[in-house]
Amino acid sequence: MRRLLAWSFLVIGAGLGATPAGRYIVYPTVTAGADLRFPRDHGAHPEHRTEWWYFTGWLEDEQGKPLGFQITFFRSRPATDPDNPNAFAPNQILFAYSVLSDPSTGKLIHEQRVARAGFGLAGAATADANVKLLDWQLERGTDGVFRARVPAGSFSLDLTFKPTQKAMVNGDQGYSRKGPKPEQASYYYSMPQLAVRGTVVKDGRSVRVKGRGWLDREWSSTLLDPKAVGWDWAGINLADGGALMLFQVRGRGGDALYAGGTLRRVDGSKVVFGPNDVRFVPRRRWRSPATGALYPVEAEFVVKLPEGERRFTLIPLFDAQELDGRAAGMPAYWEGAVSTNGGRGYLELTGYAGDLKL
């Protein structure tokens, strides 16, 4: 879903600051042969059209009650005139989303922020992860621990994310195809098995929490094929210490335009999945009373491994994890906490409340 939100608010910003005779920027193309380096690639890549820092995971409070969470910071570069002298021209736009899934209420609560970079209000550093957006902040300390602080009206999160493993580089050394054309790709790595600690403030109560998280980092300029109408993605922290990322990009009629993923085993060895190695199989659907969308909230990702086929059945923490952003000019989608045989993680389902317009 982070892809859809990134492109949605990018389109909103694209018309700002351009002039009729203006010269539009040319974005760099994502190509094979990536050489990802850290901590540099934890930081922003402002020359590319869009990127995100996407945290998800499962938390438990002091009574052992589960919560799901998502914190995502986006950076986008609108296609505006680079010679525009107007200080208010949006050369970079920052957007962030925070979501809490609470099975005790069976509801999602969410908050968001958006601002153009500059004026001391918003910005994303390039040397390391350090993103500021109004009163929200994401930063990586010298000890390698990420911290996200997202105070909001209905709830607040203050969480630290301590890496327990090295980054999982997806695709071909970080070059991750998302479509049939080679330029339909991103630079992409994940940081699974993050040790999460912090506080959740909800209904006026501050609760200590801990759990396991996942960070997805992607940046790109041309991501999806024009025939794409949606996608299904999962990031799973496996109970044995391994990690699994799988995705399918759908065309009209539900056919798979492209698919892929990564399995990192507990010994550190990796299996990189190609388009013919991954299938997404819906098992049970839930209809949203708000949008009427029919989501495959219980499904299987079927993968081909060297030792044979394996099925990962995804079960939602609860069904009603749809986020309806239509009132704010955003799409409706489903993104929620799920469990599987031998793991926990997050599933995103897009394009079920209407075809994506990218």
Q: What label would you give each PLM region?
A:
Residues 19-358:
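Structured soluble/peripheral alpha/beta segments that form catalytic or ligand/cofactor-binding pockets
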Residues 6-15:
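Bacterial N-terminal signal peptides
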Residues 1-4:
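Positively charged n-region of N-terminal signal peptides that target proteins for export
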